[in-house]
């Protein structure tokens, strides 16, 4: 029965992984989450909190125009999209090396210095953040559904390794099946097992929804088993086919979704800087609207929105990392640094469903393998490759659901078309943001409670 409050009510899981935004960058100012007012924020070796990222006070002779700050630090600063072109900020480095130097073995003091080295005078963008005025649709999702404020990307690195965790929980650290994968480079075809293949073997339906422009983010295309799949096979039909725009919406509205859907954005809709959050919001809204348009589909569907990694954008929470030598969690190929694979920095994750309504926060520690483990819980299909450390460290998303709470009506969300049109205009007509100088202002997090999911009467 609809609203009975149990795992078996869920018939469809839709997962959309967008690109390159950190949690603090989007939601550090959101009330009731672990944001800019975090009482547990760590202290740096300078004696300041982690938000005071060390910055050169004077420019070196070799680069006299390098960004400096007389305060010796740079605080998070608002990217005001109403008065500047800040909907379209440049990307900052999220390469394996610079992600690890930003993390700095857990000291968390390298965000500005690493990105000045990698990106020159665009480096300070690492500390920029948005407010509700700048990304109203994203905030509306958080205010109406459940946001995860301890969700980490899986790898201290870029898109490809993180999306490999998204579909396989693995980057082949010992280099026996085409890896290790620490960068976005065309590989020898990968040969380890993916979760979609495990679903196929178990007879569980799934589909990749992608257009011809998939921004090279469907990493299944890099696997030998998919590259060699016959045109009529499940691996090809579900994993490699491209669709015209609107196919997912049609399938959702006509109750034809598979058990698992993975959505792939186009480049423009991906939210990867310098593409706009507003274009991403319009894309996300179209998917949620299609699910909600059919009450029967809404009543049995979970939509998970997450982000592959943080770009080079600051987040203040120290990611969980394993002890040195943990099997499957360090790159062991000769010549590689003895760095952990992850977890990476926090990224946004919002779960949209009848059982996650109410503006809740889920604070269990998650990463990209958590979505796979939720599918494992739902389907009974075991994830290949996932390490014991990942299973012990990151949850399976179940704690984000409030099955004890009877679902309410689908909330009304703000429109996205007007916001997108305004964003396009502002990007083309307003000046670029300026970076703070001396006498900086500490970022303000809005106040207010945020309830946690209630699962007490009907446990998963």
Regions found by a protein language model. Name each.
Residues 1-460:
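N-terminal pro-sequences and low-complexity stem/linker regions of secreted or lumenal proteins
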């Amino acid at each position: 029965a609809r609203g009975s409050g149990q795992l078996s009510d869920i018939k469809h899981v839709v997962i959309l992984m967008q690109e390159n935004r950190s949690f603090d960058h989007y939601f550090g100012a959101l009330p009731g989450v672990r944001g800019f007012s975090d009482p547990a924020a760590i202290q740096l070796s300078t004696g300041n909190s982690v938000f005071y990222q060390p910055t050169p006070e004077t420019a070196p002779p070799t680069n006299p125009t390098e960004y400096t700050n007389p305060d010796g630090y740079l605080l998070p600063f608002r990217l005001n999209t109403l008065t500047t072109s800040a909907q379209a900020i440049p990307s900052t480095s999220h390469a394996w090396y610079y992600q690890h130097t930003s993390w700095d073995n857990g000291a968390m003091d390298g965000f500005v210095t690493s990105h000045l080295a990698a990106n020159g005078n665009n480096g300070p963008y690492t500390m920029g953040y948005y407010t509700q005025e700048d990304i109203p649709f994203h905030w509306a999702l958080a205010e109406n559904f459940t946001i995860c404020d301890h969700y980490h990307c899986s790898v201290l690195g870029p898109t490809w390794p993180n999306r490999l965790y998204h579909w396989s929980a693995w980057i082949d650290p010992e280099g026996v099946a085409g890896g290790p994968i620490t960068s976005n480079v065309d590989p020898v075809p990968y040969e380890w097992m993916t979760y979609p293949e495990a679903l196929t073997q178990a007879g569980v339906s799934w589909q990749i929804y992608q257009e011809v422009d998939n921004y090279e983010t469907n990493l299944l295309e890099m696997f030998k088993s998919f590259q060699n799949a016959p045109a009529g096979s499940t691996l090809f039909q579900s994993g490699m086919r491209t669709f015209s725009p609107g196919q997912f919406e049609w399938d959702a509205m006509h109750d034809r979704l598979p058990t698992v859907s993975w959505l792939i954005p186009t480049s423009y809709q991906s939210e990867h800087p310098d593409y706009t959050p507003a274009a991403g919001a319009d894309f996300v809204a179209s998917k949620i609207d299609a699910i909600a348009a059919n009450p029967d589909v809404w009543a049995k569907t979970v939509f998970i929105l997450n982000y592959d990694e943080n770009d080079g954008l600051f987040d203040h929470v120290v990611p969980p990392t394993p002890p040195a030598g943990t099997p499957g969690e360090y790159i062991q190929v000769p010549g590689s640094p003895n760095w952990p694979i992850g977890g990476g920095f926090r990224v946004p994750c919002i779960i949209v469903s009848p059982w996650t309504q109410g503006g809740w926060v889920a604070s269990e520690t998650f990463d990209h393998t958590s979505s796979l483990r939720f599918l494992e819980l739902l389907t009974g299909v075991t994830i290949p490759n996932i390490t014991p450390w990942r299973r012990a460290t990151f949850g399976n998303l179940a704690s984000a659901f409030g099955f004890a709470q009877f679902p309410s009506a689908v909330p009304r969300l703000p429109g996205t078309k007007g916001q997108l049109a305004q964003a396009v205009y502002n990007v083309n007509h307003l000046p670029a943001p300026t970076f703070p100088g001396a006498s900086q202002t500490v970022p303000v997090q809005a106040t207010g409670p945020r309830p946690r999911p209630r699962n007490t009467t009907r446990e998963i």
